[in-house]
């Protein structure tokens, strides 16, 4: 298994996947000319090259120094950051990734998981931000055998606690293992 992993990393197809300049400007623009968008494009290229697991982290943009808290860790100015910085990047990159995978016939065999490690407090703090909150958060799944158009579970009216069908991290892990890994790999 270790040799197989090394062979994948060292393959010409994997090395070529990192050459984003091989993509046309229209495709690169569709993903968004920001780090997250180009990281999603790289993820698609790595999947095409045969990678079995790709994790896309959300890198901080070099000019993003508006607040001390990076990325989705919105302890300050939550509404402004989500509206002006974060959602526009997510809204360009994620749908484009899903469309590209579908057009290439890869979405059915690729599970896309969008999540953070916890949620945010239901109410703003004194700095207009939201702090860490482990009681309730959202995860999105697409492709890989997931039937789309579903919402499973619900929060209370302020998004503070689960109100219907609470799921735990181990439930998500079991779903991922069931959909993508199967018994042959456990």
Question: Which residues fall in each region the model found?
Answer:
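Ligand-binding pockets and gating/stacking loops
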Residues: 1-183
